[in-house]
């Protein structure tokens, strides 16, 4: 996708509009039983819950536990759903697909009068439109949406397998709608964009199903970059990816929890592998454009928020944690970055400079 705002706009729209979907009544469900974090609070289906049975006569029962996904909050434990498309799951699915239709329609509305066609954008080759940053953006956006939908389906009583299948299918279908819309613009639809969407959706849903979503994560960030003045005179197509960075994160907190070991202060850090491009998207292409990969050590902002009492038992807590799991905060990492064009390594400031 070129003319539209790619994965970032699609994910932002999805998070805002999906917040309107909520079930008709509070339910409870055992979410991710192997994880000891706040997000996994709950008890297995069929457990009556400690809150309902005081240990001794006269003891005040503990308040019921709650779990929120954006603005939908439920009381744990939740009974299994009697059908896959109950009211809550149906609303989330319909809203997700509705977002896809709305985003898909924006391109043809802005640039009407074009017949449908596909283009071969390829993936991460040097001479592609965005050097692969567009595909990384699609991947991360779809992984994030699949993660969100999976959680939403779980708190509406769906099983792990049902949540995996439905979140994967709905996210891929959203990507398909968007590419159909792109196919009716001057830029054309892209099978490579849809492939990146499908891979991201699968990994996002699979990480949630496998219970290791607290170990790996994906972030998209803005990196303010001063581009050369000469680029200001060259027409630009779509997004300027010179101001974006894409991260694959490995979280020490989750690793420690799964190993049943306290990582200590390392809990508040994460190891990231970054991908970024500079100078792409111009027409005609500029010779100075380049691609970089990097290794970073950065702050795990959601884990820091949890340490000060933010959790997913409130709508604002869950929304805040999700926002910082998706958005990479600038200047909270140090790293080294390899430039494929110059074949040189650069220091922590590389994402913010155009070499």
Residue ranges and their predicted role:
Residues 240-246, 289-293:
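Residues that define the transmembrane beta-barrel architecture of outer-membrane proteins
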């Amino acid at each position: 996708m070129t003319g539209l705002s790619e994965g970032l706009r699609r994910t932002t729209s999805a998070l805002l509009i999906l917040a309107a979907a909520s079930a008709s009544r509070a339910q409870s469900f055992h979410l991710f039983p192997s994880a000891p974090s706040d997000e996994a609070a709950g008890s297995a289906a069929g457990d009556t819950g400690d809150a309902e049975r005081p240990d001794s006569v006269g003891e005040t029962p503990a308040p019921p536990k709650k779990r929120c996904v954006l603005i939908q909050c439920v009381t744990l434990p939740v009974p299994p759903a009697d059908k896959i498309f109950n009211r809550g799951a149906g609303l989330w699915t319909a809203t997700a697909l509705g977002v896809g239709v709305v985003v898909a329609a924006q391109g043809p509305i802005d640039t009407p009068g074009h017949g449908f066609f596909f283009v071969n954008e390829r993936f991460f080759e040097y001479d592609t439109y965005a050097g692969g940053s567009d595909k990384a953006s699609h991947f991360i956006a779809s992984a994030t949406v699949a993660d969100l939908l999976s959680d939403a389906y779980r708190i509406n009583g769906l099983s792990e397998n049902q949540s995996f299948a439905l979140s994967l299918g709905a996210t891929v279908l959203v990507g398909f709608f968007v590419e159909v819309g792109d196919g009716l613009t001057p830029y054309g639809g892209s099978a490579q964009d849809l492939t990146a969407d499908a891979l991201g959706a699968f990994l996002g849903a699979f990480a949630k199903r496998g219970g290791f979503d607290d170990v790996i994560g994906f972030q998209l960030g803005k990196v303010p970059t001063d581009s050369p003045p000469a680029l200001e005179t060259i027409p630009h197509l779509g997004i300027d990816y010179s101001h974006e960075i894409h991260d694959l994160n490995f979280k020490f907190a989750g690793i420690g929890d799964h190993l049943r070991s306290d990582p200590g202060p390392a809990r508040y850090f994460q190891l990231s592998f970054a991908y970024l491009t500079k100078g792409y998207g111009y027409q005609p292409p500029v010779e100075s454009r380049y691609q970089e990969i990097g290794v970073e050590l950065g702050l795990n902002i959601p884990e820091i928020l949890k340490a000060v009492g933010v959790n997913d038992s409130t709508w604002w807590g869950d929304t805040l944690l999700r926002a910082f799991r998706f958005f990479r905060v600038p200047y909270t990492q140090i790293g080294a970055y390899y430039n494929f064009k110059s074949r040189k390594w650069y220091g922590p400031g590389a994402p913010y400079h155009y070499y």
